[in-house]
A protein has these predicted regions:
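Short, glycine-/aromatic-enriched active-site segment of Class I SAM-dependent methyltransferases
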Residues: 2-24, 28-32
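Generic beta-strand/beta-sheet core signal
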Residues: 2-5, 45, 107
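Long hydrophobic segments that form regular secondary structure
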Residues: 8, 35, 44-45, 60
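Extended interfacial segments that mediate partner engagement and assembly in macromolecular machines
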Residues: 14, 19, 24, 44, ...
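Structural beta-strand/beta-sheet cores of well-ordered domains, especially the beta-sheet scaffolds
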Residues: 24, 38, 53-57, 102
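Hydrophobic C-terminal alpha-helix "anchor/cap" residues
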Residues: 34-35, 177
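Conserved S-adenosyl-L-methionine
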Residues: 40-51
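Hydrophobic, well-ordered beta-alpha structural blocks that scaffold small-molecule cofactor pockets
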Residues: 56-207
């Protein structure tokens, strides 16, 4: 049995956050090819949703060498569209952030949120990170050099909050503030900014 993150979710949701610990990313097709190349056949697979989408596969070793052909057209189309939409996504996110005349904080200083800020290059619009982990507080995020605050050090009620936590933890943070401007930057989430949701819907049925 194997369980790996399903990168199809990144393609589908234009999620440009990455875990630097993950050397390889898979979807069902590429995982199947890796297994076939090592003479394993998938006998069952399913997906689950927790902090993102994951693929679970059950595979068995074949006694005889398996024959297979590689067809990567579907993956190629997904990758090209994901790449093509990057600049559009970046510009729309910058436009979205520029409209606010308040401090903007990313709540949750984890690997995905830090990499998202750095890879998209939006550090200049962000006032800092907020995190409840005391070991992170009053330190600085590599590259963006943004300070990490505790929730008591900033006025969250009068700020824009970008949720950089897993969807299942969002409500716990929302209860801490009366801010009217709370958005997620980590799919899957119902709190993504509208421009992001529109981008997802417009590209949902592209082949």
């Amino acid at each position: 049995m194997l369980e790996v993150p399903d990168h199809d979710m990144n393609f589908e949701n234009f999620d440009y956050s990455f875990w630097e610990e993950h050397v390889n990313y898979f979807n069902l097709k590429t995982l199947e090819l890796i297994l076939l190349n090592n003479n394993f056949r998938i006998i069952h697979h399913e997906t689950t949703l927790y902090s993102g989408k994951a693929i679970i596969v059950f595979a068995e070793k074949n006694k005889n060498k398996l024959k297979f052909s590689i067809s990567s057209n579907d993956n190629f189309i997904k990758i090209k569209n994901y790449q093509k939409q990057f600049n559009t996504f970046k510009k729309q996110l910058e436009t979205f952030l520029k409209k606010f005349k308040k401090n903007i904080y990313v709540y949750g200083c984890g690997a995905r949120s830090c990499n998202f800020v750095n890879l998209i290059g939006i550090g200049k619009y962000i006032s800092g990170f907020v995190d409840d982990n005391k070991n992170k507080q009053n330190k600085y995020v590599p590259d963006s050099n943004l300070k990490i605050f505790s929730s008591n050090q900033v006025n969250l009620d009068d700020s824009v909050i970008l949720l950089g936590v897993n969807a299942e933890n969002e409500n716990a943070i929302i209860k801490k503030t009366n801010s009217k401007n709370i958005y997620s930057i980590l799919p899957p989430s119902t709190r993504l900014p509208d421009f992001w949701k529109i981008l997802i819907e417009k590209n949902k049925f592209k082949k």
